[in-house]
Amino acid sequence: MSAKPIYKRVLLKASGEALMGSQGFGIDVAVADRIASDIAEARAMGVEVGVVVGGGNIFRGVAVASKGGDRVTGDHMGMLATVINALALATSLRKLDIDTVVLSAIAMPEICESFSQRATLYHLSLGRVVIFAGGTGNPFFTTDSAAALRAAEMGAEAIFKGTQVDGIYSADPKKDPSATRFDRLTHSEILEKGLAVMDVAAVALARENAIPIVVFSIHEKGGFTEILTGGGRATIVTDN
């Protein structure tokens, strides 16, 4: 297999759950360091990388609504959780001497820069890893939707969705041993089959902008970079 990457610019989506590792809450620094190592390898290959991180390891906005609270406030709390995760991942990357910037959809200038497409493209042009925090900056949108949105804005050639398993299955393979794994799908098939890999808005936005989605296990060290060169194990979602 050639070590030459088949993608030049990608968006990596890492869930808060992934950063939690085997812990019940918070950030496992060893996991953050491992993900950072994979990103560093991608940068060494010349791939430009943007990252969207979730916040579910710290807080989920829907939890507030399920207890009778205000969903908007809950989502704002969830957005703040993504900022914490973004700063943690940025710290892990900087330990590897990877130039990294955090851009937040919610203005907090004392902590990180504010998001704009112009800032994103500028930092990418300088070879920096760009971590997007704060989701879309609006309630009622998931970080999957933020990933699709940022991928479109940065001109990403693919969205790499790091999950708990090595691709898209017909059902949760951890609960259903008979679940079937898909090697390739279209965006439309995901929507038609109701496959729970990303929310409907995210998949629709990726389809509209013809952005492939690559679903892989974020827990396999080196898996991200292996897939970047055309190998590895993943489900590839395209528009045809």
Swiss-Prot record:
A Pfam family this protein belongs to? AA_kinase
Give the gene name: pyrH
Recorded GO CC terms: cytosol
Specify the superkingdom. Answer: Bacteria
> Which InterPro entries does the record associate with it?
AceGlu_kinase-like_sf (IPR036393), Asp/Glu/Uridylate_kinase (IPR001048), Uridylate_kinase (IPR011817), Uridylate_kinase_bac (IPR015963)
Subunit details = Homohexamer.
Instruction: Name residues in a coiled coil.
Output: none
Matching PANTHER family, A to Z?
Answer: URIDYLATE KINASE, URIDYLATE KINASE PUMPKIN, CHLOROPLASTIC
What is the protein's species of origin?
Rhizobium meliloti (strain 1021)
What is the name attached to this protein's record? Uridylate kinase
Summary of the function given for this chain in its UniProt record: Catalyzes the reversible phosphorylation of UMP to UDP.
**To which protein family does this belong?**
Belongs to the UMP kinase family.
Q: Does the keyword Lipid biosynthesis apply?
A: no
Location(s) in or outside the cell: Cytoplasm
Q: Which GO terms describe its molecular function?
A: ATP binding; UMP kinase activity
State the pathway, as annotated in the record: Pyrimidine metabolism; CTP biosynthesis via de novo pathway; UDP from UMP (UMPK route): step 1/1
| Region annotated Involved in allosteric activation by GTP, chain positions | 21-26
Quick one: which residues bind ATP? K13, A14, S15, G16, G56, R60, T163, Q164, Y169, D172
